[in-house]
Swiss-Prot record:
This protein's name: Chromatin assembly factor 1 subunit FSM
Biased composition regions of type Acidic residues, renumbered to the chain: 638-650
Quaternary structure note: Component of the chromatin assembly factor 1 (CAF-1) complex, composed of FSM (FAS1), FAS2 and MSI1.
Keyword match Coiled coil: yes
Cellular compartment(s): Nucleus
Description of the deletion phenotype: Dwarf and weak seedling that dies during vegetative phase.
Coiled-coil intervals: 329-439
GO biological process: DNA recombination; DNA repair; mitotic cell cycle phase transition; nucleosome assembly; regulation of G2/M transition of mitotic cell cycle; root meristem growth; vegetative meristem growth
Basic and acidic residues composition bias: residue spans: 330-429, 445-461
Record's note on what induces expression: Cell cycle-regulated, showing a peak in the G1-phase.
Compositionally biased spans, kind Low complexity: 430-440
Principal localisation: nucleus
Length: 940
């Protein structure tokens, strides 16, 4: 037979798989003993094996308990527990140095006693006869309470059992791992080998997994010794944990760890308690064994007698009554002994239950005390938290009050700023009124009769002797002085010439164009972002002339105070003044002006046009050494290149690319609105007070007529001028509200016939020369020519043809003429834009590129009436008839105005000064009607 079968190991595999099974058992044992305290399964204590803790006296024992070996350690533990209770709420050290040293010394002393007692308990080896036991039972008896490693233990058992049949080293090893386990009752390192380690502090001990393998008479002592070893292990573990807490750095402040360690140490049985427990268990087993022995001794004489009679063959007559009597007596004695033993056991159990109850009561009291203290601590923490919350609320309230105060201060500051802005606005309005008055006075001087000019001729010698004064003091006298110089120039008839007037006018236009910011090249006419919310009218020529001729305040300040620094010098370029002289006069007044240089900025790889203009501010951040820094005063997101989009040449910016469905939908919407929403106010309708105030103007005229006749005629002219300005402002606002341009023409002047009149002398000749200068157009030959009247429709067609010829490259000729009829058919059936039209053609001609198709469409068709239509010459070439175009007349802007928005005819006839001619002419493209209004009255 094989060794595996002999040892009772169930291995259905062959013998060569024994090593794998051994490795599996070894791995299981390693996993089980990986913990630091108990390996595999430990023996459990019976309820009757429990013992009182530490200072509780041992009662109900047959012999008095011996004296404690370490009373100093118990006193030290009690004293430590009292100190921990007193210093639980304090922040100082948990133990004094003397108490700590005493506790460490007591623990070490008790640890030595426990190790010695463990050797006494575990030093027993079983005595048995090998022939009377099975192989597994013999191996179990040999490995029980052995401290050797696995290899040495297997060798020792194999030496003793090698005489038996079927025993080998491999079978012994597998049987040891199968029926036995190695327990650790001490303290060992985590890296130690569980099956081979033999350190003394680990207290290794081999035990059988099931006591049924051991003979019956040996089970009682083994169970008692296992209980003793388990109690020793619990005490050693508690002592080691206490020493680790005491030896750890900063252990004086770890009150909770000390309390837990002392509680664990007090719960574990000390050395004296373990000895008492072992002694009682031994007495119990002895009593049970004595009772069993008594019963067996009573039966032995009868068995010997029967045996002897059977052996010798002699049958004696024994009195049956005497035999029964002896038997009953023995049975009574046995029952009595058993009752006595049971009584003692019950009494011991009762005493132990009482002790356990008392111990449980003490533990409950300790827990209640601990809970009470924890509750008090929680209440204190709650109060502290409440106080902190109240402090935080108070702080938040103060912060809120401060925020309210700051808010009120800020509000007051804003109100003060608003008041200041209001005052500044009033000052600006007052300044505007003064400018209007100045303009009126200028017009008044312009319309003065010849008497004023004659008055200016008399003190002519005084003008030559005028001394140059400070330009800052002569700012208000510039405009009247210029007017007087012009009047005096008109009075000198012999000095006037056509070339001189032309040259003077051209030089004036050049100077004015340098100050017109909107005349620079490269300006974006249609930016994506509106520069202004509403159109701002340009200043009058008088205000602009005043601004040009006004001296620079910073220049005057620097001329008067050269050494004094000016903070605004960093923002404005200070340039020298230039004297402005008038041609044909002897009067020269040096007027300082600002000759501002213009700058051209062009960036590489930028699609946007170059910047051309004046930039007079100096940045405090951007400079020659750091040109790539960002100025915080500039907004770099507004004028970024992302907003710029290149427009395709020849594309219409209108809604020409709408689908046919969208156009039909819009027409239906317009029809529905006209039919259903006829009660709505139409676009362009104005209320009673929003139209041209003709009634108020007529009232002014009536008031002027009712004034006394001796009033000056200049007042009437001034009123007429104000009325004209009011009408102009009203028409301008109306045009802005409708987003429609307002063209003001002055072609029908009352003195237009002077241009063609001849044989004029005196003032009429001078007026004719002035009108010729104003109406002339500079040509290469230098002669004055009239612009011919050009039909707008023919000019538009010619420009369209030129654009189409320029935009059609030679690549369009790549399409054969055979496909021209199909292309014309698609163009005639499609009412969409150029992009969708090209898509439709590309589906029919996929071999031709879209760019060639687009060029071909632009070559043979033109965009008319919001759609692409084939040219007539192309249709005639193909022999096709041109489809009649939809003659939908565009709506004029005059249809959006009601009659109340325009002056009545009787008002125009009654007031010659307010005679306004409203003409509507087509613009260059012929798409919309722009109202043209003649501002100045006509004599016709």
């Amino acid at each position: 037979m094989e060794g595996g079968k002999l040892l009772g190991v169930a291995h259905p595999e062959p013998a060569n798989n024994i090593d794998a099974d051994l490795r599996y058992d070894l791995g299981q044992s390693r996993m089980q003993v990986d913990g630091p305290v108990v390996l595999n399964r430990s023996a459990e204590l019976e309820p009757s094996d429990s013992m009182a803790i530490d200072d509780v006296p041992v009662e109900a024992s047959s012999q008095p308990a011996p004296a404690k070996q370490s009373p100093a350690l118990m006193d030290t533990i009690v004293e430590v527990q009292k100190q921990l209770k007193r210093k639980r709420a304090s922040s100082g050290p948990a133990l004094a140095a003397a108490d700590k040293d005493a506790l460490v010394a007591g623990c070490c002393q008790e640890l030595e006693g426990l190790l010695e007692y463990y050797r006494e308990v575990s030093g027993h080896r079983m005595q048995f006869e090998v022939g009377n036991l099975s192989t597994n039972a013999a191996i179990g008896c040999l490995l029980e309470e052995s401290s050797l490693g696995l290899s040495k233990l297997v060798d020792e058992i194999y030496e003793k059992l090698k005489g038996m049949e079927g025993v080998s080293a491999t079978s012994v090893r597998s049987s040891v791992l199968l029926i036995g386990q190695r327990m650790m009752y001490g303290q060992s390192s985590p890296d130690a080998d569980v099956l081979e380690d033999e350190s003394e502090t680990a207290l290794w001990c081999w035990e059988v997994r099931d006591l049924k393998v051991i003979p019956l008479r040996m089970r009682g002592p083994l169970s008692t010794r296992r209980t003793a070893r388990k109690k020793i292990h619990e005490r050693i573990t508690a002592i080691y944990s206490t020493l680790s807490v005491l030896e750890a750095p900063g252990a004086e402040a770890q009150v909770n760890d000390m309390r837990k360690a002392s509680l664990k140490l007090s719960k574990a049985l000390n050395l004296e308690g373990i000895k008492s427990l072992v002694e009682r268990a031994t007495q119990k087993s002895n009593i049970e064994r004595g009772a069993k022995n008594t019963g067996s001794t009573a039966k032995e004489p009868m068995q010997e007698m029967v045996k002897s009679n059977n052996d010798t063959g002699i049958i004696e007559n024994v009195d049956d009554s005497q035999l029964q009597k002896n038997t009953s007596t023995n049975e009574k004695d046995t029952q009595k002994a058993q009752k006595q033993v049971e009584k003692e056991l019950k009494q011991k159990e009762k005493e132990e239950a009482r002790m356990r109850k008392q111990q449980k009561k003490q533990q409950e009291e300790a827990l209640r005390e601990q809970k009470r203290r924890e509750k008090e601590e929680a209440e204190m923490k709650k109060q502290q938290r409440k106080q902190e919350e109240e402090a935080q609320k108070e702080q938040k309230r103060r912060e809120k009050e401060e925020a309210e105060t700051r808010k009120q201060q800020k509000k007051q500051q804003e109100e003060a700023e608003k008041e200041q802005k209001r005052r500044e606005k009033e000052a600006v309005q007052l300044k505007k009124q003064l400018a209007i008055q100045k303009q009126a006075s200028m017009m008044e001087r312009f319309f003065k009769n010849k008497k004023d000019s004659e008055k200016l001729e008399k003190p002519g010698g005084k003008d030559s002797g005028v001394q140059t004064t400070d330009p800052c003091t002569t700012n208000k006298e510039v405009v009247p002085l210029v007017t007087s110089i012009i009047d005096s120039s008109f009075s000198q008839k012999e000095n006037w010439a056509l070339e001189d007037l032309r040259r003077l006018q051209i030089s004036g236009w050049q100077k004015l164009s340098s100050y017109n910011r909107s005349s620079r090249w490269g300006i974006r006419n249609k930016p994506k972002k509106e520069a202004f919310k509403e159109l701002k009218l340009q200043k009058t020529s008088d205000n602009m002339l005043e601004e040009i001729l006004s001296p620079n305040e910073d220049t005057c300040h620097n001329l008067s105070q050269e050494n004094e620094p000016d903070k605004s010098a960093n923002d404005v370029d200070m340039l020298p003044a230039v004297e402005l002289q008038f041609h044909g006069t002897n009067h020269a007044n040096p007027l300082p002006t600002r000759s501002i240089k213009r700058k051209l900025l062009q960036f590489d790889k930028s699609n946007r046009p170059a910047y051309y203009g004046t930039w007079r501010k100096k940045s405090a951040v951007v400079g020659p050494r750091c040109p790539l820094k960002m100025d915080p005063d500039l907004d770099y997101e507004v004028d970024s290149d992302d907003e710029w989009e290149e427009e395709d040449p020849g594309e219409s910016l209108s809604d020409c690319e709408k689908d046919n469905d969208e156009v039909m939908e819009e027409d239906s919407k317009i029809t529905d609105e006209e039919s259903e929403d006829s009660f709505f106010v139409p676009d362009g309708y104005l209320s009673d007070n929003e139209g041209i105030q003709i009634e108020s103007l007529l009232d002014d005229k009536d008031e002027a007529s009712s004034s006394p006749p001796d009033q000056c005629a200049e007042v009437e002219e001034f009123r007429a001028l104000l009325r004209q300005q009011k009408v102009l402002n009203t028409l301008t606002e109306q045009a802005l509200r409708k987003s429609q341009p307002l063209v003001i023409s002055n072609l029908t002047h009352e003195k237009a016939e002077l241009l063609t009149a001849g044989d004029l002398k005196g003032t009429s000749k001078i007026e004719q020369l002035c009108l010729q200068v104003l109406s002339m157009r500079i040509c290469p030959g230098g002669a004055t020519i009239d612009l011919p009247v050009i039909d707008s429709s023919s000019a538009n067609a010619e420009e369209t043809n030129q654009l189409n010829v320029k935009s059609s490259p030679a690549a369009a000729s790549a399409i054969p003429d055979t496909d021209l009829a199909e292309i014309v058919k698609v163009i005639g059936s499609c009412r969409d834009g150029i992009n969708k039209l090209v898509e439709s053609l590309h589906q029919k001609f996929p071999n031709v590129s879209k760019s060639q198709l687009k060029n071909k469409v632009r070559e043979i068709s033109e965009f008319v009436d919001n759609r692409w239509q084939v040219k007539k010459e192309v249709l005639s070439k193909l022999g096709l008839s041109s489809s009649p175009a939809s003659s939908k007349k565009p709506k004029s802007i005059a249809t959006y105005f009601s009659k109340r928005c325009l002056p009545p005819e009787e008002a125009i006839l009654a007031s010659p000064e307010l005679r306004l001619k409203s003409k509507t002419t087509q613009n260059v493209n012929g798409d919309t009607d722009i109202p043209r209004i003649n501002l100045l009255p006509s004599s016709q």
